């Protein structure tokens, strides 16, 4: 149907009798959502709205990411590989969205930010319960982080629950054990509150998978999905650190951290270390060469 005079007529079937019925705004509770942006600067600094919306939308994406990662864990517990891969694929896209979102905040200049930074007080993204929840789901367990949420007993309890449960990676290791891979017994039951650290006893398991991809295609595909998730998460961390550096330089963070230096430390944290370590040894013959002093000792 052509458009006349740059106007588009309402089609006869479009609902206009919406009194008392479910509407778009009602379903999404937009009255509540769009009234949650309340600048504290007086008079309201123009750029504080950007700062608020950046972080509020990040929290919405984090809520979805946590939802998907919890589902991935349940699918692994049920040996539902394809369903797990589906939600991991969505998780990767959510992380990509979170990463690209930093480009909006990067338009905030140092002088603009300093125009309202004081009103933030001690509040900081470091206090994001959902971010910490996701780190715990992925395996970056750290009981010390519970101290930050002492002011919020309900939130602290939520964090403690995921801290004390197997992470996504630990459930993956248990899945591998159920399918005959030589996963050490300690991964069936251990202190789940401790962060997973690189374990050389797991390397042969992943070497076997990566050197026999046709035979272990399901396991291999899940490994690569997890690598994708960690890679995208690290890109998000990196983009966060660079955005902070761009906006405040090397000032201390509002939450009391060293700022950029503290964020740089996060880049050294890893979720699935063996999935990266195995890349060094895949296809490499680690046996001593013939004629070497060690050749006859094997």
Curated annotation (Swiss-Prot):
Molecular function as annotated in GO: heme binding; metal ion binding; tryptophan 2,3-dioxygenase activity
Lineage: Bacteria, Pseudomonadati, Pseudomonadota, Gammaproteobacteria, Lysobacterales
Top-level class of the enzyme under EC nomenclature: oxidoreductase
Bound cofactor: record note: Binds 1 heme group per subunit.
Family: Belongs to the tryptophan 2,3-dioxygenase family.
Biological function: Heme-dependent dioxygenase that catalyzes the oxidative cleavage of the L-tryptophan (L-Trp) pyrrole ring and converts L-tryptophan to N-formyl-L-kynurenine. Catalyzes the oxidative cleavage of the indole moiety.
Pathway: Amino-acid degradation; L-tryptophan degradation via kynurenine pathway; L-kynurenine from L-tryptophan: step 1/2
UniProt: substrate binding residues: 51-55, 113, 117, 254
Effect of residue 55 to S: Decrease in catalytic efficiency using L-tryptophan, 5-fluoro-D/L-tryptophan, 6-fluoro-D/L-tryptophan, 5-methyl-D/L-tryptophan and 6-methyl-D/L-tryptophan as substrate
Superkingdom, natural source: Bacteria
Subunit structure: Homotetramer.
EC number: 1.13.11.11
Catalytic activity: L-tryptophan + O2 = N-formyl-L-kynurenine
List of residues binding heme: 240
GO biological process: L-tryptophan catabolic process to acetyl-CoA; L-tryptophan catabolic process to kynurenine
Protein's recorded name: Tryptophan 2,3-dioxygenase
Keywords from the named record: Dioxygenase, Heme, Iron, Metal-binding, Oxidoreductase, Tryptophan catabolism
Cofactors demanded by this protein: heme
Regulation: Weakly inhibited by D-tryptophan.
